[in-house]
Amino acid sequence: MLGLPTETEEDMRAIPELADQIARRYYEIPKEQRNGKCQITTSTSFFIPKPFTPFQWARMYSPEDYLGRARIVNHTMKQQHNQKSLKYNWHEAYVTVLEGVLARGDRKVADAIETAYKMGALYDAWGETFHYEIWTAAFEKCGLSIDFYNTRERSLDEVFPWDFIDTGVTKAFYK
């Protein structure tokens, strides 16, 4: 996962380094004992703070920031000794941003969802049919800001849309 609140560049670079260490271990096996070619696929998703977790107060990054983090991992992957055995995939940053709004949005987001649908957003979980510009236009049309829901740090005293739900764990526990 990329984009956690305490993440450092060293953390990002450690992902491809670990993949390379695994490939190195494979190549330590004598050729006659190996079972096929070594191919390691590493995939990352981007951090989305969720309700009822200690991260519910955390901010998300912008799509550009997430893609920058993926570029660091991808670039480091290409620098590894066993780069031909390594492959890297990452989740779509703009889909992540929308997922963040849906995860922590309030009742006003319902209007934006309906508006996006009426503007042509359909089957948006499929990458080839996802149109971020429809969603941003829908939010703007409803007078809402995606950044309000995602990129701002939330106060420990903020009242969340899900606070009325009793999960058996108090908000104070997460703080």
What is the meaning of each model-derived region?
Residues M1-T53, D65-E92:
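Conserved C-terminal portion of the radical SAM core fold
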Residues Q79-K175:
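Radical SAM enzyme core and accessory elements
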Residues R13, E17, S62-D65, V97-G105:
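A broadly tuned preference for mixed-charge, low-complexity surface segments
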